[in-house]
Amino acid sequence: MEPAREPPARARPPPPAARPAPAAPRPRSPAEAEARGPEGLLRRSGSGYEGSTSWKAALEDTTTRLLLGAIAVLLFAILVVMSILASKGCIKCETPCPEDWLLYGRKCYYFSEEPRDWNTGRQYCHTHEAALAVIQSQKELEFMFKFTRREPWIGLRRVGDDFHWVNGDPFDPDTFTISGTGECVFVEPTRLVSTECLTTRPWVCSKMAYT
């Protein structure tokens, strides 16, 4: 009987080949470094960056338009308020007297055309923030007759035995003489005349000029 044979020995696999060492990184050129930097990123983003700039410009333009619109509305409101104030009475006028009034000294005068009684003339002056004219000198009387020849009512009236101006001042007989026996006074070129208050004639209003 033959002895048992030993199985043949297995061949060992060859050891793995050694991996080559990684190559050293190649240095970047200046162009590549610039392309990888922030400016390169902006250039690569392209239209996105330009779109952001356009959006900011549009926003600034809209803001400017809104601001100009608000200024225009404010100016219009100021003009409306000034027009309303001017219609109620002159506050700061370019001329010292209203339209159709005449300036003499520091007063404005209005000479009516239609005849009315003394009280109606007084009421008209009152509604225009004035009074029937108070005459304080002969020169003032002469001025009045440069613009009227119709012997108008003035703001002088008898109260009891004495005459008083409508502004409350007493009448000075040394300045003017008064003829007639009536209560209300009108003027002639050289004197004052009293007559019945219901007599109709034109009148003269006066008030202080605007300053």
Curated annotation (Swiss-Prot):
Identify the SMART domains for this entry: CLECT
User: Which terms does the record give in the GO molecular function aspect?
Assistant: carbohydrate binding
Where is this chain's protein located in or outside the cell? Membrane
Keywords on this record?
Disulfide bond, Lectin, Membrane, Phosphoprotein, Transmembrane, Transmembrane helix
Membrane-protein topology: Single-pass membrane protein
Q: Which residues cross the membrane?
A: 66-86
Q: Could you tell me which residue ranges the C-type lectin domain spans?
A: 104-206
Phosphoserine is found on: 29
- The protein's superkingdom reads Eukaryota
Query: Which SUPFAM superfamilies does this UniProt record tie to the protein?
Result: C-type lectin-like
Q: Which residues form a coiled coil?
A: none
Segments of skewed composition (Pro residues): 10-28
Which residues does the annotated region (Disordered) include?
1-53
Q: What is this protein called?
A: C-type lectin domain family 2 member L
User: What gene is this protein translated from?
Assistant: Clec2l
